[in-house]
A protein has these predicted regions:
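Pre-Walker A adenine-sensing motif
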Residues: 2-19
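Interdomain hinge/linker elements that couple catalytic modules in large macromolecular machines
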Residues: 2, 148-325, 337
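A cross-kingdom feature that marks ATP-driven nucleic-acid transaction machinery
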Residues: 2, 25, 34, 45, ...
């Protein structure tokens, strides 16, 4: 069973032969290698590229350990280029090679090679794309399966697929398992023995217990504004552990560098500026988040919000958390300042959308809560409320678009309604 990753294949096709290093980044086990070595390679072969002109190197395999030496690897690539024809280099997990940017820069100076690399750590990739390749690095971010991709190969109906996706996430391997036990064991094992171990070893972390607990704290607080100071207080009061703000901040950065979590900044909509140190943190894959918590804390509201956030990133949007300041009267009739939250401020080019995510909108109180933030935004960009279920999109009397989660997830252009 093959999962089509057409969105990413199209991005590779559009960048083919553009004279830049194509750097495919994303969390480990999200399908980067399959995209490159199977899907994209097949595209090259089907479009007339000779197999001898495709050079494949997987640096995470023990069989290629010697190629982690940059000089040995460069010589291997040069020796594989037997003529002046165009060659395509597919280089997997490039962060295993020290000074890899020197090898790639040398390849950039050769006119007859088109280079594609993958990597699983942004610290060694995203910053280097800018600084080392001098504008000739082109990053393509890959994510775990979107719900639409997951559903396309799921053996069951929408409701069952949605329940499974909320619990076990979208790592491609998950769809091959039949039992819940297999899925749970797989996620727990790779979180401890792949993801967390990678972070600890790569960053030479001594405080192993602390970063493990930090992951638990972040997993318990998806979609909740927080900062290192608040987390340090949690460690002190609930765990009787000393964990400095700076160390917490560094460890959060390490988790983000490994693509395990994403940070959403808070944006003052009226003031048009970013504010404060509080961030919201979301997990790149909810199955990993849930496995870390031993599949407890299944809060559908925050899980749904996390899924919407990830889907927006997959579609190429920039996503922030919105804040709207208003003045209101308290119980004593005094005029007080209040801060209302908009779940997501979504930007792409000159397009902007304001999005609220609501698991349940049946009560009048909940409707007021979700709509009030949108009512106080002083511009005419589209305002959307995504609710749980299969509701088709419609506009209410105030012009807000209300749509069900199913419509949002299964229609790539759903925000254009």
């Amino acid at each position: 069973m093959e999962i089509k990753r057409d969105v990413y294949l199209q991005q590779l096709i559009e960048r083919k032969d553009n004279g830049m290093i194509k750097v495919i980044t994303g969390i480990r086990r999200c399908g980067k290698s399959f995209l490159l070595f199977t899907i994209f390679k097949r595209y090259l072969l089907e479009n007339g590229i000779d197999v001898d002109h495709i050079i494949e190197i997987a640096l995470d395999g023990i069989e290629n350990e010697e190629l982690r030496d940059p000089k040995v690897c460069f010589k291997y690539i040069k020796d594989a280029m037997k003529d002046d024809g165009k060659y395509y280099l597919l280089l997997d997990e490039v962060q295993f090679m020290p000074r890899f940017e020197e090898v790639l820069n040398s390849l950039l100076r050769m006119s007859n090679i088109d280079v594609y690399v993958t990597g699983s750590n942004s610290k060694f990739l995203s910053s280097d794309i800018v600084t080392e390749f001098r504008g000739r690095g082109d990053e393509i971010r890959i994510y775990p399966l979107s719900f639409a991709e997951f559903y396309s190969v799921y053996d069951g109906d929408y409701d069952d697929a949605w329940d499974d996706y909320m619990i076990y996430g979208g790592l491609p391997q998950i769809v091959s398992f039949q039992s819940e036990r297999q899925k749970a064991d797989y996620l727990k094992n790779i979180f401890a023995n792949v993801y967390l171990r990678d972070v600890i070893e790569r960053n030479k972390i001594q405080s192993v217990d602390e970063i493990g607990i930090l992951v638990d704290v972040l997993a318990s607080a998806i979609g909740v504004p927080t900062n290192p100071s608040k987390i340090a207080n949690t460690f002190a009061s609930e765990r009787q552990m000393s964990y400095t703000n700076k160390t917490i901040s560094n460890h959060i950065d390490y988790l983000a560098d490994a693509f395990l979590i994403s940070k959403a900044s808070r944006y003052d909509i009226k003031g048009r500026k970013y504010i404060g140190a509080n961030m919201k943190y979301y997990f790149t894959d909810l199955g990993l988040r849930n496995a870390r918590l031993n599949f407890r804390q299944q809060e559908p509201t925050h899980i749904m919000e996390n899924i919407v956030y990830n889907e927006l990133l997959i579609r190429g949007y920039n996503v922030d958390v919105g804040v709207v300041d208003i003045f209101d009267k308290d119980k004593e009739g005094k005029r007080v300042r209040k801060q209302l939250e908009v779940d997501f401020v979504v930007n792409q080019g000159n397009q902007r959308y304001y999005i609220q995510v609501a698991y349940d909108m049946t009560s009048e109180e909940k409707q007021t809560q979700e709509f009030n933030s949108l009512r106080n935004i002083p511009d005419s960009f589209k305002k959307i409320v995504i609710v749980n279920g299969s509701k088709k999109p419609w506009r209410n009397d105030e012009g807000f678009v209300i749509m069900g989660m199913k419509y949002f997830l299964l229609n790539a252009n759903s925000l254009e309604f």
